[in-house]
């Protein structure tokens, strides 16, 4: 759906809020930001490559988990490179189609994390609470359906969100954040009724949270009950280790998200601090997730060291 414009004065070139960095700190910030981005790309890329190439990871859990580093790459790549370029070039111009694309991808990332974590929790519930039926339930068809449902639902919901935004006439050209999102794009409109947009946005956020949290709470509650009732300590330890990474990731995502939202509700917080909180939502998890999964998932650690050994033998 193409955006409507109220008059000929609307420019496709938008002014986006600047992230203030002292002149003497511009290049250090750019250098550190680039290292953070490259670290995230490298680590998430390694996780993706391991799942694709290591037969020990060709299991339903890791096929579903494949979507998590993929989403992390979408999130951080949609935000950090452009922000770093703007900082070093002192530019604050963004074109409307690029702005819409960035906003869509950032919203897609946030939704995909919630749905993928719910899918992983469901897989762990079946594996730990119904181990004898695991392979009969988590067939390739079921795994593919779970992955398609997670991404398909997210994409469909975000398409509707941005289609509702695109129908509004535009006349303003200032983006009040350092990145584009649905709310920033809504503020470009003039004269249009955004009631439907606000209602849908609230319903969308609530739906995603309720679905994701409900599935995870149910799954991990059942897993906890199974662990408590299980007599073998090794089985308990394995169950806890296999779920800890997902719980850490979900907790971090919710804490950072809530912190970022609350930062805009208090007027005494400096604008730059608010912008940092917003940026953290799309950078913290993409950087930390590979570390979290590498430390807490034994199969990934073993696959990584096995791949290193193969490479070492290949060059000797």
Stretches with model-predicted labels:
Residues 1-316:
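Transmembrane helical core of 7TM receptor-like proteins
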């Amino acid at each position: 759906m193409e955006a409507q414009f109220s008059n000929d004065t609307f420019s496709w070139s938008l002014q986006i809020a600047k992230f203030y960095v002292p002149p003497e700190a511009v290049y250090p910030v750019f250098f550190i930001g680039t290292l953070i981005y490259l670290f995230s790309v490298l680590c998430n890329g390694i996780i993706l490559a391991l799942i694709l190439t290591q037969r020990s990871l060709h299991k339903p859990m890791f096929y579903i988990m494949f979507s998590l580093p993929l989403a992390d790459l979408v999130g951080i790549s949609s935000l950090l490179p452009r922000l770093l370029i703007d900082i070093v070039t002192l530019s604050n111009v963004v074109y409307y189609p690029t702005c819409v694309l960035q906003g869509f991808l950032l919203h897609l990332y946030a939704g995909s994390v919630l749905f993928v974590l719910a899918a992983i929790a469901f897989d762990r519930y079946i594996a730990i609470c119904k181990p004898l039926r695991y392979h009969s339930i988590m067939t390739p068809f079921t795994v593919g359906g779970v992955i398609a449902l997670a991404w398909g639902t997210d994409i469909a919901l975000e398409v509707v969100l941005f289609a509702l935004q695109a129908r509004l006439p535009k006349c303003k050209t200032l983006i009040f954040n350092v990145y584009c999102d649905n709310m920033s794009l809504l503020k470009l409109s003039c004269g249009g009724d955004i009631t439907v947009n606000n209602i849908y946005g609230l319903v969308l956020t609530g739906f995603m949270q309720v679905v994701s949290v409900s599935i995870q709470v149910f799954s991990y509650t059942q897993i906890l009950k199974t662990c408590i009732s299980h007599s073998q300590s090794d089985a308990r330890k394995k169950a806890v280790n296999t779920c800890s990474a997902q719980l850490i990731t979900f907790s971090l995502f919710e804490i950072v998200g809530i912190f970022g939202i609350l930062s805009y509700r208090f007027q005494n917080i400096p604008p730059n601090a608010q912008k940092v909180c917003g940026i953290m939502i799309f950078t913290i998890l993409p950087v930390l997730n590979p570390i979290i999964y590498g430390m807490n998932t034994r199969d990934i650690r073993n696959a990584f060291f096995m791949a290193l050994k193969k490479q070492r033998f290949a060059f000797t």
